[in-house]
């Protein structure tokens, strides 16, 4: 029980440090027209993430992430290559997601999202990075996009985590679709 309490205290301290670092104003979110993402937290308890992939190149897959029906940020993944580890984006479908504490350095922790139960894959994360070289099969987030890249990844990741924590941080569901 003491170990659990220590872990929870460390987790809360990491969250508070992340929130203090990123008290920045960001632009209002826009509504999504896809009915799948329009479920409000009162209808389905928890957080509903919808990732719609819309740009496909040989180097990357770029999409848009919606949180509880509101457009939130851009995403970048590897192109789909038969769901191969470290070089392919994950298959479209429905997944459970949970918050995961990651140690960035000896003095600094941060949170990222772990996508669970991906067939033949493990440790698929939402995390910071700007190009497909940074992803290794994970999902990168950013505010703004270029060809095969997303921008302002650190700020975008912090805002995603902050929004998920504001919505309760539990029962996180992810739906991935190709446009």
Where are these regions (language model features)?
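Cell wall/extracellular polymer interaction/catalysis modules
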Residues: 2-172, 178-179
């Amino acid at each position: 029980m003491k170990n659990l309490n220590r872990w929870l205290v460390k987790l809360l301290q990491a969250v508070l440090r992340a929130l203090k670092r990123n008290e920045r104003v960001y632009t209002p979110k826009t509504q999504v027209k896809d009915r799948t993402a329009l479920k409000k937290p009162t209808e389905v308890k928890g957080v509903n993430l919808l990732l719609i992939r819309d740009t496909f190149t040989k180097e990357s897959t770029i999409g848009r992430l919606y949180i509880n029906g509101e457009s939130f940020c851009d995403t970048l993944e590897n192109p789909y290559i038969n769901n191969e580890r470290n070089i392919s984006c994950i298959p479209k479908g429905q997944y459970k997601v949970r918050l995961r504490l990651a140690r960035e350095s000896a003095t600094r922790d941060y949170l990222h999202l772990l996508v669970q139960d991906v067939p033949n894959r493990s440790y698929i994360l939402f995390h910071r990075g700007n190009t497909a070289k940074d992803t290794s099969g994970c999902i990168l987030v950013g505010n703004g996009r270029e060809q095969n890249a997303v921008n302002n990844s650190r700020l975008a990741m912090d805002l995603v985590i902050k929004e998920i924590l504001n919505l309760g941080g539990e029962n996180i569901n992810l739906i991935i679709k190709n446009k």
